[in-house]
């Protein structure tokens, strides 16, 4: 079980999430190896190694009585179909760790796969969402493999890193520097970046949590990237939307993440990118 799983597991089983301001924003985590940098419709093999040598994030069993039962969140409806399908080729790179991999769910049920399916059903017929994550990865590992991930030539990147840094107590300045480096390199490649956030709990110590909570909104403001404040909003802590490990979402949990958390931020970005690409080809 990874440090991420160990540290988060305890707090996910508490009866409520303790917020302090927006305590502990960290970036989302994604998971298939970049060797799996293929559109989500392709088969991928999992790996648990990265350049920073993280431990694998494996589910651990907890009893249902230990899991948090929350009121069922209101699920946004699917996207409305476009009047005219958009055939402009669009590549979206989802990069992070195990939550993007979809640990514990079928390949077609992870968030990149569901996101691609929803976009195509709505009329974005030539969109591909690439699942490029690494379980247990730190922000240093992500930066070290970024050139590999960029071979997919993404138009849009959903960037989610930093959770495993927090679990290891990596200095906040290191995490900040790595995320900024990743954003700079992604933007330099021509990719529009969406920064995904995650909340951590006070078991890491108030001082660290408070410092960590300032990283992501500050970076989003400084760089002007689109921003998802809490990637698992409405899902974290809900026993009905998480697997027995109380960490990784179920298929239904990922549906909520896609419809309620990703699409409201992604769609304005996608519309702008499509318009820009269409005008450049005319």
Task: Give the label of every model feature segment.
Residues 18, 138, 250:
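Residue-level signal for threonine
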Residues 24, 35, 110-117, 138, ...:
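Secondary-structure junction/capping motif
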Residues 1-93, 121-122, 152, 255, ...:
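N-terminal secretory targeting modules
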Residues 68-135, 145-153:
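Serine-esterase "nucleophile elbow" of acetyl-processing enzymes
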